[in-house]
């Protein structure tokens, strides 16, 4: 039987909209406008004609790590495509998972509202990114412009969103 429950999709859209607001507010001094679910999940248009490209990937349960690898690969693929446009100021992977690299040893880096540049990520996370980039031929993404954002967003209680 086909599952027609749209709650996971609605949750993902809600997370994406909230992530867009957080990213926009973080860049308010340099931002002109924002587009959500246009060509990309999130695009922030900056005053200097450059853009912040962000891929928002959510999990409905904080302890569900079954899709984090697939989410990371999908985000890297799209951000790699965005890098070809040559107008990117930043390429952001934003998620609500406290375990975005599916590695228990790195979880302490990702609890709460977290923003880490590529160079600030734990070694095992950086190696995983490089391995995925190499394995999937994502050759355009500039890791000096790559960052990871964790935005807590779990459950039905709006205080947790």
Where are these regions (language model features)?
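Acidic metal-coordinating catalytic centers involved in nucleic-acid phosphodiester chemistry
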Residues: 1-7, 58-161
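Catalytic centers of nucleases
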Residues: 5, 9-78
């Amino acid at each position: 039987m086909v599952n027609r429950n749209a709650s996971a999709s609605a949750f993902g859209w809600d997370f994406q909209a909230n992530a867009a607001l957080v990213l926009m507010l973080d860049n308010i001094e340099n931002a002109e406008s924002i587009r959500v679910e246009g060509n990309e999940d999130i695009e922030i248009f900056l005053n200097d004609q450059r853009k912040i490209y962000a891929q928002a990937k959510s999990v409905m349960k904080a302890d569900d790590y079954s899709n984090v690898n697939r989410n990371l690969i999908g985000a890297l693929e799209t951000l790699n495509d965005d890098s070809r446009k040559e107008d990117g100021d930043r390429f952001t992977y934003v998620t609500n998972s406290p375990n975005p690299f599916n590695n228990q040893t790195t979880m302490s880096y990702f609890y709460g509202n977290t923003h880490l540049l590529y160079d600030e990520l734990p070694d095992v996370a950086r190696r995983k990114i490089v391995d995925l980039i190499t394995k999937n031929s994502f050759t355009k993404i500039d890791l000096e412009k790559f960052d990871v954002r964790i935005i807590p967003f779990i459950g039905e209680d709006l205080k947790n969103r």
